[in-house]
Amino acid sequence: MPRKGPVPKRQILPDPVYGSQLATKFMNRLMYDGKKSVSENIFYQALEFLGDKTQEDPIKAFEKAVENVKPHVEVKSRRVGGATYQVPVEVRPDRQVSLAIRWLINFARSRGEKGMVARLSGEFLDAYNKRGGAVKKKEDTHRMAEANKAFAHYRW
C-alpha cells in the first residue's frame, strides 16, 4: 500500500462506436497480447448478433446481460482460531462489474461453438435471458453466501 494515500483510478475512455466505458472495459479484458483491434472486432460482431436476436439496441442488451451476471454477495475465507470460515460479504460495485466481465469471458471461451464471435454472442444471449454458465456462477456464489449466513458476524 502506498504511503501517500490511495492511488487514483485511471480514467477509462468510452469506446468509439457506442460511447460506453463498460464496452471498453470488456474489450480490454477480452484482449490477448495487446491485440486490441482483434478484440474490438470480436466484441462488435458479437454485439451486432445480440442486437439482431433481441430486437433491441445492442449496447442496452449487453448492459442488461452484464447486469444479470453481477454478483451482489460473495464469500471470503476468514481464519478464526484454528478454523477457516467462508464469510459472506457484499461486493463493491466496481468488483461486481469486473467479476461479471471475467465470468462472461471465461464461460464464452469454454463454450463449444466455432469461433469466438459465436461463443461470446451465445454467452451474451444466455446472460440476457438469465441462463448460461456466467449466470449459474452468480447463482452459485449467492447460494454459497446464503448457506454461510451464520458466519456473517465474522465480517471485518
Curated annotation (Swiss-Prot):
Report the record's Gene Ontology biological process terms. translation
Q: Which domain of life is it from?
A: Bacteria
Q: Does the keyword Iron apply?
A: no
Query: Record's Pfam families?
Result: Ribosomal_S7
Q: Where is the signal peptide?
A: none
User: Which cellular component terms (GO) are annotated to the entry?
Assistant: small ribosomal subunit
Checking Gene3D superfamilies in the record gives: Ribosomal protein S7 domain (1.10.455.10)
Q: What does the UniProt keyword field contain?
A: Ribonucleoprotein, Ribosomal protein, RNA-binding, rRNA-binding, tRNA-binding
Single GO MF descriptor: structural constituent of ribosome
Its quaternary organisation is: Part of the 30S ribosomal subunit. Contacts proteins S9 and S11.
NCBIfam families in alphabetical order: rpsG_bact
| Protein function | One of the primary rRNA binding proteins, it binds directly to 16S rRNA where it nucleates assembly of the head domain of the 30S subunit. Is located at the subunit interface close to the decoding center, probably blocks exit of the E-site tRNA.
Indicate the family of this protein: Belongs to the universal ribosomal protein uS7 family.
Q: By what name is this protein known?
A: Small ribosomal subunit protein uS7
Species annotation: Maridesulfovibrio salexigens (strain ATCC 14822 / DSM 2638 / NCIMB 8403 / VKM B-1763)
